[in-house]
Amino acid sequence: MEHIARFFFGVSGNVIALFLFLSPVVTFWRIIKKRSTEDFSGVPYNMTLLNCLLSAWYGLPFVSPNNILVTTINGTGSVIEAIYVVIFLIFAERKARLKMMGLLGLVTSIFTMVVLVSLLALHGQGRKLFCGLAATIFSICMYASPLSIMRLVIKTKSVEFMPFLLSLSVFLCGTSWFIYGLLGRDPFIAIPNGCGSFLGLMQLILYAIYRNHKGATPAAAAGKGDAADEVEDAKKAAAAVEMADAKTNKVVADDADADADGKSADDKVASQV
């Protein structure tokens, strides 16, 4: 019975994870149509690619027996993420392309090192421990990536940038693999996905709290969420503070300008008469 339950949660995790892997398709279709990556960051796709590669390697029978479902979904995810990275490299500007190539080189180096060490220097339980630790570290990093979005939701009191279905999928995916890991008594699967389940739950709670809030304006939210340009963010924040401090003076100045415009118009009419 336990074996059947574990298989069920593994298959469920495969289906939900596939949805998560395919969720950026709209973004990349936009990149292809505009032939530009605009302000999108390619870092998450490189990190997800590394996580998928390490997890797929960990699930192989000679590394971790009875975890083939881990390999199937992460192998599929590796292909999907690799396609995203290639598209990004094609349409990115030179500076972003060089950064992506550097990250891709780092991803390839880390994965190659893990594979070679596990094959040539380790065996049995030692191999499983080494590969499991590597996969766990990067899985937790991947699940922690939405923390910046959660911070943005709290600051703006708006869930505009945190879609409900995506948050629900993160929660369900993490929960499915967490239970799968528990049933298989595998901490390298249970721990990172337990973290993912918890963070997904936190996103759902934030959604329940702020779903009816108007929140900040889209322009203000975009300004606060632009992590790629810290200098510009600082300027916007300073301008917002200055506007708040000088609100009364601004109203008076506007009224004075309106009076001046009205007087100028009257003088112009009088001169014409």
From Swiss-Prot:
GO annotation, biological process: carbohydrate transport
GO MF annotations, alphabetized: sugar transmembrane transporter activity
Membrane-topology annotation of the record: Multi-pass membrane protein
Keyword Disulfide bond: no
Keywords: Cell membrane, Membrane, Repeat, Sugar transport, Transmembrane, Transmembrane helix, Transport
Cell location: Cell membrane
All copies of domain MtN3/slv, residue ranges: 7-95, 131-214
InterPro entries, sorted: SWEET (IPR047664), SWEET_rpt (IPR004316)
A single GO cellular-component term on record: membrane
Record-linked Pfam families: MtN3_slv
Topological region Extracellular: 1-6, 64-71, 123-128, 185-188
Membrane side Cytoplasmic: residue ranges: 28-42, 93-101, 150-163, 210-273
Record flagged with keyword Repeat: yes
Cited function: Mediates both low-affinity uptake and efflux of sugar across the plasma membrane.
Subunit-level organization: Forms homooligomers and/or heterooligomers.
PANTHER family: BIDIRECTIONAL SUGAR TRANSPORTER SWEET1A (PTHR10791:SF241), RAG1-ACTIVATING PROTEIN 1 (PTHR10791)
Protein's recorded name: Bidirectional sugar transporter SWEET1a
Organism of derivation: Oryza sativa subsp. japonica
